[in-house]
Amino acid sequence: DPPHNGHLEISKVAIKKLKLSELIWAVTKKNPLKKDPYFNLKKRLFLSKNMTNRVNKIKVKSYDKLTKSSRTINVIKYMKRNNDLKIYFIMGSDNLLNFHKWSEWRKIANLCKIVVFPRTGYMKKLINCIAVKSLGAEKILFIRSKRINISSSKIRKNYLKYKY
């Protein structure tokens, strides 16, 4: 929150390295583990669609109304309801550190492959990560890629600084 070029570049790398026919940006109303989002759902959907409109394989969707939830487990169950999709759940190494706090995180890892991209300053911390120790290498795929030193929180700070 907000989407940025780092998200887009990671998506392009994932499409190529995982040979994906489609990649979905599942934009949620609110992350249950974070404070209220800076931009509302409608604005984040607009920004995400605008950012990804030149990459045919990226689709931007919100499942909150369909699943009546913002929880990842409900989105994944909804996606798998009528077909045997192979789902890759993509996250940065910063999110993997707190993955054990997510609702039904072990079930998420059983329903899909967790794909992790490096974030500056986080890879060494994963040595003691609960999710890494618990799930092991068969459930988590680390993808090497160029590290993009950009963060949504820095973008929000700069936005506020120049907004006023």
Where is each model-derived feature located?
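Nucleotidyltransferase catalytic core that binds NTPs
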Residues: 1-164
